[in-house]
Amino acid sequence: MSDFVQQQSVECCFESSESWVILSPIEQSIKRKIESIGTPLKDWDIQINYGIKTGFNDAFIISTEKRNEILDNCSSDEERTKTAELIRPILRGRDIKRYGYDWADLWLINTHNGIRGVKSRIEINDYPAIKAHLEQYWDKLSTRADKGDTPYNLRNCAYLDDFNKPKIVYQELTQGCAFALDKNGDYIVSNTAYLITGKNINYLIKLLNSKVIQFAYRHFYGTLLGDNGLRWLAQHITKLPIPKYNGTEIQNRIIGQTEENNIEESIYQLYDFTKEEIKHINKI
């Protein structure tokens, strides 16, 4: 037994501040390279937040058919216009794919609670057609925990305006990487998804969707679900060491490339991985 242990053992270095993870020599080398040139996302100029929590989705997340019905019930063109502006397309976690999304024709009635000192909360009496719709669910709305100043309003959300910005959106539970770019800030996301706003997201999304980061999250930084599942929690994503954008030739190439194999190859070059390390990463 002692001979077997000596033959099969690997030397690992443990930092007292980190969780203990047993890594093979090649995995230790990969981790060292990732951390030597990467900066944890918590030190980037970005913000990661979860999607909107309504407290009762049946009332606030509606189909296109229901949206049109509400708009048809508006008593004036003015009410119809401002009501249409308040009802926003929404993505659920399951709608978000790698580099894209399949919008399910769902909308959020965004009767937000305002932002203190910045934006007033929605006054429901200014939206009679929406009020009539929500009153059908009064018993549920009035007793739910996640509500604003009135049962008609959504809970406080300090980053409400971030939904209007260009952003990366992603779902929490996946089998791999599933990050998509909402270039124009068109969508709100539900509480089964997250959003990332800030600088250089066109570059960041290429790294987040890469095999390198999927490997690193799975083996070093993330939370596993069963044999293949990943849970992309914000507190773990912020640990990911990714090279900050400095306008290098390789980084600009990564941004400009659209072919997946070319993107992956450039990212391998960015981290200076050997052929053996690349082969090991590709086993995921």
Predicted ranges, named:
Residues 3-6, 10-249:
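Polybasic, glycine- and aromatic-enriched phosphate-binding surface used to engage nucleic acids
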Residues 236-271:
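Extended amphipathic alpha-helical segments enriched in small hydrophobics
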